[in-house]
Regions:
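Two-component histidine phosphotransfer core
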Residues: 1-128, 133-143
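Glycine-rich nucleotide-binding loop
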Residues: 114, 147-155
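A short coil/beta-turn micro-motif at the C-terminal edge
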Residues: 99, 148-150, 160
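C-terminal beta-strand of the catalytic ATP-binding
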Residues: 155-162
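Short, charged, solvent-exposed linker or helix-capping segments at domain edges/interfaces
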Residues: 165-167
Length: 167
């Protein structure tokens, strides 16, 4: 059982990590290891669990040794959390990374109302801009599957071969 002090310490740590990530996003460009991006995602999810106690979060990071453009995956996770907690007390978000023969994949799943992220994505972050950045820097494709009242599955596929990664 966590003590109140441990819980507060974790919240302070998560908040500082997330703030650092946001400040770095102003001037950082290029690629980072997914492991680094995932550390900011974990910090964000930790903060959200504190704000939304009913939020269930699962991170399955089977593979993290590939690169992504800085600050492109975390905004997608933010959108999934917003969708999950918007209409449900018991929202759920799953973030997975795994490897296929031809690509690395990052999957973000929410149990929100199933509205397409393309239609709903926050005004401050342009979904199409993220798509373009992922495509131009690592050749990634984004697949979105959504079902009304069931949620959304967003998969980012980063090819292993046939694309030159621009750093």
């Amino acid at each position: 059982m966590k003590t109140h002090d441990q819980s507060n310490s974790r919240l302070i740590y998560d908040t500082s990590m997330f703030m650092q990530h946001n400040m770095d996003a102003v001037y950082k460009q290029g690629l980072v290891s997914f492991d680094i991006e995932l550390s900011y995602i974990r910090a964000y999810l930790g903060m959200q669990k504190r704000i939304h106690p009913g939020l269930e979060v699962l991170v399955e990071d089977k593979v993290t040794e590939f690169k992504v453009p800085y600050n492109t995956i975390e905004p997608l996770v933010e959108n999934a959390v917003e969708a999950a907690v918007e209409t449900k007390q018991d929202g759920k978000v799953v973030v997975r990374s795994y490897e296929r023969l031809d690509c690395f994949a990052i999957q973000i799943v929410d149990n929100g109302n199933g509205v397409s992220p393309v239609k709903k994505f926050r005004a401050k972050q342009d979904f199409r801009g993220l798509q373009k950045q992922l495509k131009s820097s690592v050749g990634a494709l984004i697949e979105v599957r959504t079902k009304p009242d069931k949620g959304t599955i967003l998969t980012v596929k980063i090819p292993k071969q046939g694309y030159v990664i621009k750093e």
